[in-house]
């Protein structure tokens, strides 16, 4: 235990991948990314040179319009002098680089082709929780903050002192409510903090987000325009909401993954929350250090809609990358083939509207289980592309890469690539046409 004192666990870097600045970054929200050579997978130097003054959450998002990446991560203090100096240069105040409780959430902007993020801003959280995913629109970034929290300094100190794992310090506190943090991309300022309706929903992943004009209560508007007089913009946030809302039951499965049962109630359904923002007002006065100290505007959740109610319980959805931040019709999901399954093992396409249609559930035969879907576009149409998945074959103890037609998911397989080996269950992957140009 003494060897672990004052030493945070290393980041597993096992959740997602990002190609940036000619490097492959392996991500998990528990720390900075591992940096790899994308051609050889050799580990390269520390990511401190990127100047991100925080951890690096697993799901930064890329704006399809210009390739700008927006990411976030908890800031537990600068990890090195080099990181601290780069962060101050990017706009953070020195005070925001010191440890605090709860840890602030740092947002950063990284333009395509730049060697590191250009802007950063840290914001105080209402409670100490880790952030896994982020949603993006043309003008905002949104993160969901479920009340799965480290409750106090004492619990946090026990992790720092090596007395127990960080994951063992969290408690489900539904009375705190689930919040959505809305960040204005132009300034990286906190625009609003919205509480979602009780009982507090919980999720790991978002599906998408988009903006609409706020004409009046209950009316549809035009995507991506300013709010009407008397009301601000309306943001639609679509999330993978855990079906039974029992976060402790879900987390208990990770304690012994070999015996885990991710049954239907622990999987997700697609839910859209419509958030009404107040009319635009002059930005609050903040210090030049960029510590995100301004008070957020008062905003509200005006509607909750369950989408594609007939969809199979699912996780790890994917959409056409050109539709990130704007209204998408389809998502491709990793779902349970039937109610007897204890792990997601099939694929489905769902329509992201109330009462939306769903495709047939795509299965791959007895003893074969699909992994999460990855959409690879061939054109701008939402279903113009391929869906890739790794399929494990229990009889052969090997994994195949299976390629499906996104427009006809349950039709004939486009191609199957036998890998000749077993791949363990995976989370997320990426596709890049030319690794050398990123």
State each model region's role.
Residues 1-217, 229-438:
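Beta-propeller domains
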């Amino acid at each position: 235990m003494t060897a672990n004192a004052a030493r945070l666990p290393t980041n597993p870097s096992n959740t997602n991948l990002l190609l940036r600045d000619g490097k492959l970054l392996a991500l998990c929200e528990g720390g900075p990314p591992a940096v790899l050579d994308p051609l050889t997978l050799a580990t390269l130097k520390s990511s401190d040179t990127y100047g991100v003054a925080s951890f690096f959450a697993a799901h930064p998002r890329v704006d399809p319009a210009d390739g700008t990446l927006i990411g976030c991560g908890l800031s537990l203090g600068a990890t090195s002098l080099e990181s601290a100096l780069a962060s101050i240069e990017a706009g953070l105040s020195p005070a925001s680089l010191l440890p605090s409780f709860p840890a602030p959430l740092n947002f950063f902007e990284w333009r395509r082709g730049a060697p590191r993020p250009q802007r950063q801003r840290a914001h105080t959280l209402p409670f100490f929780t880790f952030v896994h995913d982020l949603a993006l629109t043309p003008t905002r970034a949104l993160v969901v903050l479920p009340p799965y929290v480290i409750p106090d300094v004492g619990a946090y100190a026990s992790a720092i002192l090596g007395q127990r794992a960080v994951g063992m310090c969290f408690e489900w506190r539904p009375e705190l409510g689930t919040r959505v943090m809305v960040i204005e991309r132009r300034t990286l300022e906190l625009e609003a903090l919205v509480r979602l309706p009780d009982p507090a929903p919980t999720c790991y992943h978002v599906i998408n987000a988009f903006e609409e004009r706020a004409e009046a209560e209950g009316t549809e508007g035009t995507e991506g325009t300013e709010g009407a007089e008397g009301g601000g913009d309306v943001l639609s946030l679509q999330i993978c909401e855990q079906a039974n809302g029992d976060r402790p039951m879900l987390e208990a499965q990770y304690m012994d993954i070999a015996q885990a049962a991710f049954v239907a109630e622990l999987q997700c359904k697609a839910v859209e929350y419509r958030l009404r923002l107040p009319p635009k007002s002059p930005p609050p006065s903040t210090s030049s250090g960029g510590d995100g100290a301004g008070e957020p505007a008062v905003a509200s959740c005006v509607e909750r809609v369950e989408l594609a109610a007939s969809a199979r319980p699912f996780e790890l959805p994917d959409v056409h990358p050109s539709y990130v931040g704007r209204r998408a019709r389809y998502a491709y999901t990793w779902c349970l083939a039937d109610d007897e399954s204890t792990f997601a093992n099939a694929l489905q396409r769902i329509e992201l509207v109330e009462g939306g249609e769903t495709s047939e559930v795509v299965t791959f035969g007895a003893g074969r289980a699909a992994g999460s879907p990855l959409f690879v576009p061939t054109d701008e149409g939402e279903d113009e592309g391929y869906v890739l998945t790794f399929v494990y074959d229990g009889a052969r103890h090997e994994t195949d890469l299976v390629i499906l037609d996104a427009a006809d998911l349950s039709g004939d397989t486009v191609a199957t690539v036998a890998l000749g080996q077993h791949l363990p269950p995976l989370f997320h992957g990426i596709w890049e046409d030319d690794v050398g140009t990123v």
